[in-house]
Amino acid sequence: MSNVLGMYARSVKENFVKGNGSYLYTDKGEKYLDFVQGIAVNALGHNHEHLVKTMKTQSEKPWHISNLFLIQEQEKFAKRLCELTKFDFVGFQNSGAEATELAIKAAVKYYYSIGKPDKNRIVCINSSFHGRTIATISAGNNPKHIEGFPNLPNFDHFDFGNHEQFKEKITNKTCAILIEPILGEGGVKVIPDQCLKGLRELCDEKNILLICDEIQCGYYRSGKFFAYQYA
């Protein structure tokens, strides 16, 4: 019996022992093309020579010195990301769920800090996926994820493609709109470029923040560094 807590229904019995590029190999020598990519988080493939060399080099340096101190590699990475995205700052997190949590907290805290504490509601798409914390499952509003858990009250939802329903959810208490430019677990639905442009214009007009969750579709998975860049 496995000592790993049974959080996932593992119906696949293959035991992968080696990876190379986009391929995985089992202990029986079988070769598989990896379309799963660790649930869309391993966009760089397996065992890339450059990455292996980089990790070996870093393993001989301090492993963790806390964000209270200057970390040169972190500074370099942040600068590169800002060059690619044209943003000014990067906040590093341990996971996609934590990144979405940070975005949710930042949106609410921003309006609180400028004297608008009641502007604290976030509009999201039904059955989207933003993580498995209490806040992120409330944002996603997927019945199979929120069953048995308290649904946080600060989220308003609309069905994908229902523009009228979306407009009804925008109020003077809306602080942000949280979307996946390409819904993953919601059915691989792509928000059209014109709709993304319209969202940006609406947010500018209404003084609302726009949050794009690209944990599963960013890093060139769609062709560009981020999917929102098509708009």
Language-model segments: what does each one mean?
Residues 1-231:
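Conserved N-terminal phosphate-binding loop of PLP-dependent enzymes in the Aspartate aminotransferase
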